[in-house]
Amino acid sequence: MYIKHFTLITLVVAMITLTTACKRERTTYDGPNYILFSAESYDLGVIDNEEWFDIPITATRSCGYDRQIGVEVLANKSNAIARRHYEVESNTLTIPAGKLTTSLRIRGIADNISVADSLGIALRLILDEEDVWNAYGTEASVILHKCCPVDLDAFTGYAKITSTWTMQYMNADARLVRTRKDAEAENTIIVEDMYYDGYDVRLKFLTEDRLNPAIEMEEQVIGSTGEAFGTIYGDGKLLMTTPAGYSNYYSSCERYVLQYVTMYVANVGTVGTYVNIFEWISDDEAERIMREGF
């Protein structure tokens, strides 16, 4: 299961159980009973048709009896379609006696969601008026995002790089390269001769967060200043690093990488920041490019 949300649980828990630093006895929350979603919004990374996601619902007090609550989908605020893009397991939920939480279960239908979609589901709790915490209300939003499993093989072979570096310094809008897995580093590929012959570059795919498929790159030498600029600067090494404040990411569904890089020469200065877009292509397309060019 994969879900991201901005949580209110910390606040609710703080209200439910209070402790004092100077006394041994435990002081418990004895205020009104409220029921609410644990967050205002949730982002679900839908990777198949089988995975169920839990949308937590929290009460501020436990009771000695089961509590039935309802959840409705607000069709006028939703663009996701029930039974086409998602399924709700049940709109009627129970907070068991003595408990504080329950969950609405939602299953995304990946086959009917495209990568470009941002499908929203607006939810509202059906509660008695005295159970509504007006400061937070009864509504929450769920966004369905299409994700794909990470297959490093999809990022090996021929790739086309469209690069502002090659446009400015190599008189080329794009460059054809080959990539392969790094046998010594997990989830890492090697881009052979990325800009200049003999200078390979390693890119690491971060796979822990399917909603944030990021790329990491350590500082690397990617060429000589003589080859890049026609003269020697500093120690003659052209270095490439990842600039702060930029997002470098990949798409497993679409087989591309977007990468920002900063070029510099040690003890001399920064050349600039540039963008690379890697698009993996078939062997047939690569052969056509080698024959005819871009």
Language model feature labels by segment:
Residues M1, C22, G245-Y246:
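Absolute protein N-terminus
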Residues T17-A21:
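C-terminal motif of bacterial Sec signal peptides marking the signal peptidase cleavage site
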Residues I9-T10, F205:
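Intrinsically disordered, low-complexity segments enriched in polar/charged small residues
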Residues K23-S103, R107-T162, R288-F294:
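Acidic/polar, low-complexity intrinsically disordered N-terminal segments immediately downstream
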Residues C147-F294:
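Ser/Thr/Gly/Pro-rich, low-complexity flexible regions
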Residues I3, T28, I121-L123, V191, ...:
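Intrinsically disordered, low-complexity peptide-like regions
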Residues M1-I9:
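Bacterial N-terminal signal peptides that target proteins for export
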Residues V13-A14:
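Repetitive helical segments and hydrophobic/amphipathic motifs
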